[in-house]
Regions:
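Short alpha-helical segment of the dimerization/phosphotransfer core of two-component systems
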Residues: 77-85
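Short conserved segment of the HATPase_c
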Residues: 196-210
Length: 255
């Protein structure tokens, strides 16, 4: 009888643990679904604006009214709007790939990856007359998904270039080095001449978050750049932060 009581007690404990885990899993699924709904609601809102602009331009040109008689001007504006929409759709596809694809890492020379990304951005940096300071070792290897890390470096560099004012003395500084132990790396990208309100820092990795309402439309950003960076770094188990420095903004991560 005593043994039966122990077995029953053990079974009840296991059932209780299983129920608690089930509740936890259900709650987690609810949170994920809530985030997914919020994300697609934001996507719908973000696409609605350029579609409305396009519709207005095309309607005005077809009717030939007022300022819309200058068809070449509004055709150019319409093309720019569709290019922004195309950029957003590409970023949305990236989000989908990150969420659905099997995450595979391999030993990768991320120093070479970062150098190539900087070379690709050289013209953008020169066009804004920004100073570029680079400190990258000849080689630095890490177990990463190389395609996804390319996206991290690309988004971070583009973000720094877009939001650095075109003023004399402003610069972008890129640092890559071994981390505090031999298995990790540390990367830092800093841009000067701009600051982010402290209350906005915690929201920067949210999809479509804007520090200022007009910021993305002025700079051409999709509103998904840092959100994608966050997703990729989370999958790599990396730690990261973004904050103000004495003369600008700095993003850093370790993995």
């Amino acid at each position: 009888m005593n043994e039966l009581s122990k077995n029953l007690s053990r079974a009840l404990e296991e059932l209780k643990s299983a129920n608690e885990k089930l509740k936890s899993d259900i709650e987690m699924e609810r949170k994920i679904e809530k985030k997914r709904i919020a994300f697609f609601s934001a996507v719908s809102h973000e696409l609605k604006t350029p579609i409305t602009i396009l519709k207005g331009h095309l309607s005005g040109m077809l009717q030939g009214v007022g300022e819309y008689r200058d068809r070449n001007y509004y055709l150019q504006r319409s093309l720019e709007t569709t290019e922004k929409m195309e950029d957003m759709v590409k970023e949305l596809l990236t989000v989908s790939r990150i969420e659905n694809n099997k995450f595979i890492t391999q030993k990768t020379d991320i120093a070479e990856q970062l150098r190539l990304q900087i070379a690709d951005m050289a013209e953008l940096i020169e066009n804004k007359k920004l100073e570029l300071q680079v400190e990258i070792p000849e080689h630095l290897y890490a177990d990463v998904n190389p395609v996804m890390m390319d996206k991290v470096f690309s988004n971070l560099l583009l973000n720094a270039i877009r939001y650095t004012p075109e003023e004399k003395g402003n610069h972008i500084r890129v640092l890559l080095k071994p981390g505090t132990d031999t298995e990790t790396v540390y990367c830092q990208i800093e841009n000067t001449g701009v600051f982010i309100p402290e209350e906005a820092l915690v929201h920067l990795f949210e999809a479509f978050y804007r520090v200022e309402q007009s910021r993305n439309s002025q700079t051409g950003g999709s509103g998904l750049g840092l959100y994608i960076v966050k997703m990729i770094l989370d999958q790599h188990g990396a730690s990261y932060r973004m904050g103000n420095t004495c003369d600008g903004v700095c993003f850093s991560f370790s993995l």
